[in-house]
Amino acid sequence: MLDACLNPELAAEITCQPVRRHGVDAAVFFSDIMIPLALAGVEVTITAGVGPVFEQPVNSVTEVNRLVERRILDASAVEKAVALAVAELGEDTPVIGFAGAPFTLAAYLVEGRGSRDHLGARAFMHAEPAAWDRLLSWCADLSGEFLRIQVAAGARAVQLFDSWVGTLCLADYTTRVAPYSRRALESVSVPRIHFGTGTVHLLEAMAECGSEAIGIDHRIPLDEAARRLPGKVLQGNIDPARLAAGWENLAAHTRDVVERGRSAPAHVVNLGHGVPPETDPAVLTDLVTLVHEL
């Protein structure tokens, strides 16, 4: 996976394929939230059925102090991949860059791999607040630099992914995570989308981090999200499970999502999370066609 992300021609081709095959209106740059860590020399592998695995977890003050000395040394593969995709797609189809949010990166680093509740990261946050600040600051700067690299190469919008932030309570998010997400988002001036999963209790706090749009997962109706986030563009929130529920069910659900999305100033129609790998590609094509007709 990481090798594919760092092969410019292959990454550009994978970026462009959904536009050609499904007719989507924008292309999300093909990469992985682990790429900036790998470019900074952090030893990480993607293990089938597990996800990212770190040879040396960053779960002590000593390890944090060692980590924060690292910097991205060579991003030429990413720069070339974005530039190739931008050139291929032209002016009518923007490329969207992305990066992992500081908390999600830190959770992986502290625990050495993904976990259900991220107890290790949450414990470290409270047990070593000064080291947590250094770690989150470093992650914010790394993600910010990764976003800047993509924008400089031609990406016209970016998205900050906080996959694991839903495990936090509001107080911890507001005081110990949100400032660093804001720091990462402030690194670029193109339109920014801020997305997390399981974040119904965090939406207002996320909206204060400086993005123009908020990504919404399937757990809350879009009209309710729009009421809670006045003036914010929304992205989402088709339930990925509906892709395997039959066309009539998916179509009815999609119409409902689009109708509720009209409550927001604008709505970027998308899934509430990633495409399940077993999804029939033809269903995605039909879904895009339906949305364009609504």
Name every feature range the model reports, one short phrase each.
Residues 38-42, 57, 106-110:
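Short, conserved acidic/polar surface loops in the N-terminal third of protein domains
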Residues 1-48, 178, 183, 281-294:
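N-terminal basic, low-complexity leaders that serve as flexible interaction/assembly modules and, when applicable
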Residues 43-52, 111-116:
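A glycine- and small-aliphatic-rich helix-loop capping segment at beta-alpha/alpha-beta transitions
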